[in-house]
Amino acid sequence: MAMTNIPYGSDQAIRIQSAGLFAAVMQRNTILNRLTGPMPMQSDAENAIRVQSSNKYPIVLCKDLSKTAGDEITFDLVNPLGGKPIMGGQNAEGLGRALSFSQDKLRINQTRYPVSAGDAMTQQRTRWQLRSLARAAAEEYMNRLMDQISLVHLAGARGFHNNIEWAVPLQSDVDFASILINPVKAPTKNRHYISTGSNIEPISASGNDISIATTDVLNSDVVDGIRTVLDSMAMPPSPVIFEGDKMASDSPLRVLLVSSENYTSFVQSTNFRTLQAQAMARSQTAGGNPLFMGDAGIWNGILIVKMPKPIRFYAGDPINWCGSFYTETENTTDCVPDSFNVDGKRVFAVDRSILLGGQALATALGMNNKTGNPFFWSEKELDHGDKLEVLIGMMNGTSKIRFNQDYGSDGKRVTDQGVICIDSAVKIAGV
């Protein structure tokens, strides 16, 4: 009986491997991926060119098979209606309120990462299969890169924490803008706060120093302040509705991503084991969603979760912020006070926490012309077959969702749709 044989490096093999890669990336076991809504079932999507995940999650995924590298994808917001109703027998004809829309867009581009799998003699000297190791390492790197790009866009800053685990370079790097594809935008004025140690207040500066002290930490009082601000502001980020969460309507949630140091500061201010138990109980009504498990806790309707890397600013580092509700113009010269250093050493820093509601971030996926999906593998033999290079790639783009929203008598304000940033002081671990 004839057997099907798919040759090494053939187009069919690449398509099969790339489809497997796409599935693996979509199911990667990371915090940020769990904040992405599930894609529609194939039966619902097979006839659609543009497929979008649930907008009830913080990260909205759009798979647009009509797009190619460098193209733009647009998305719209229907502005809320205001004004008074018409009562009794008063004339209503011809007085209908006009719908108005705000629009945002993002670009997609090709990202590639090659890994050398060595040559024939390198393979001879080791018992490890270098080709398999190269593929695994490349996939891990691309997963890390995708999560960090999402984190930086949500935070509106890269920060200055840096070690080998960062795949996204510092903003001063010449390739930073091209790697991020879309501009990294500081939080809008109505979405940027700082801790006072007992509450939050809009970010401000004095004498080129951000108005924050080393005692302005994140604690339970500050999280209560966040909830109070959410309840009192016009058009706050909408609650997150996780798939299968039976309590979503009765007990709405937002998600607060915090650094490890901010997490420790919060834990020390309250009985966190009770909060963990509440999160575990909530997971039972949300289909066992792993986001609620482990270190997560629920406080005052806010699910507190550790972020994968800190967005951190040290003494003397600038924190960009918007001084007007009506423009995206950023103040770029105000810095963390020198008092965050002690005897010339970095002892304290400012870490950014990220509060997420629905539709905070958009990730668009394009189509590779060889594989038919956004992710692809390539393997190439060099030097007459002596050496092997493995390449992983993706066709995508990520951007924070931002609209010029109509606030009625307050006019149209530039607004980050589903994310609020809170800056607070931390003591650097290990110092």
Spans of model-derived segments:
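N-terminal "assembly arms/tails" that initiate or stabilize quaternary assembly
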Residues: 1-106, 406-431
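Sequence/fold signature of self-assembling virion shell proteins
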Residues: 2-29, 33, 175-431
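Intrinsically disordered or highly flexible coil/loop and linker segments, enriched in small
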Residues: 27, 31-32, 36, 40-49, ...
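A broadly tuned preference for mixed-charge, low-complexity surface segments
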Residues: 50-51, 126-138, 166, 306-326
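Long, contiguous amphipathic alpha-helices that act as assembly "spine/axial" helices in icosahedral shell
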Residues: 75, 102-201, 247-262, 384-394
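Outer-membrane beta-barrel and related beta-rich outer-membrane complex signature
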Residues: 87-89, 161, 165, 402
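Short, surface-exposed, charged/polar-biased interaction segments
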Residues: 96, 136, 152-155, 159-166, ...
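Short acidic, glycine/tyrosine-flanked loop/strand segments centered on an H-E-D-like triad
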Residues: 96-126, 352-372
